[in-house]
Amino acid sequence: EDHDEMVIVKDVDIFSLCEHHKVPSTGKISIGYIPNRRVVGLSKLARIAEMFSRRLQVQERLTKQVATALMEILQPQGVAVVVECSHLCMVMRG
C-alpha cells in the first residue's frame, strides 16, 4: 500500500551523555518524514532516536544521525528532526 501523507512523532524522551564532559543531557526529539511508499511504525522512529542517543553524543550530531538514518532506510521525500535538550554540563558550569 502506498503512503504519501506526512508522518510525525513528537516529544519522544531521549537521554544521552555529553561526549566532552561525560555528564547527562535529557530532552525531547520530534521526527517527521514524508514517505515515498515506505512507512514504519511510530515506535521504530523512537527506537532509532534511542539508539543514537545512547552513545556519547553532541546534540548536533544526534540530530544529523537520526535524519541520515531515516533517509537511508526509508528513502522518503523529506525528513525533519528537531532535538531540544537540557545539558547538565551547561547547567553545572553556569
Curated annotation (Swiss-Prot):
Domain of life, per the record?
Eukaryota
In Gene Ontology terms, what is one molecular function of this protein? GTP binding
Q: Which residues bind Zn(2+)?
A: C18, H21, C89
InterPro entries documented for this protein: GTP-CH-I_C/QueF (IPR043133), GTP_CycHdrlase_I (IPR001474), GTP_CycHdrlase_I_CS (IPR018234), GTP_CycHdrlase_I_dom (IPR020602)
> Which terms does the UniProt entry file under GO BP?
folic acid biosynthetic process; tetrahydrobiopterin biosynthetic process; tetrahydrofolate biosynthetic process
Keyword Coiled coil among UniProt keywords: no
Per UniProt, the keywords (alphabetical) are:
Allosteric enzyme, Folate biosynthesis, GTP-binding, Hydrolase, Metal-binding, Nucleotide-binding, Zinc
Tell me the Pfam families matching this sequence.
Answer: GTP_cyclohydroI
Keyword Ribonucleoprotein included in the entry's annotation: no
What pathway is this protein a component of? Cofactor biosynthesis; 7,8-dihydroneopterin triphosphate biosynthesis; 7,8-dihydroneopterin triphosphate from GTP: step 1/1
Q: What is its EC number?
A: 3.5.4.16
Q: Which family does it belong to?
A: Belongs to the GTP cyclohydrolase I family.
Its biological function? GTP cyclohydrolase 1 is the first enzyme in the biosynthetic pathway leading to folic acid.
Assembly, in brief, is: Toroid-shaped homodecamer, composed of two pentamers of five dimers.
Protein's name in the database:
GTP cyclohydrolase 1
Originating species:
Phycomyces blakesleeanus
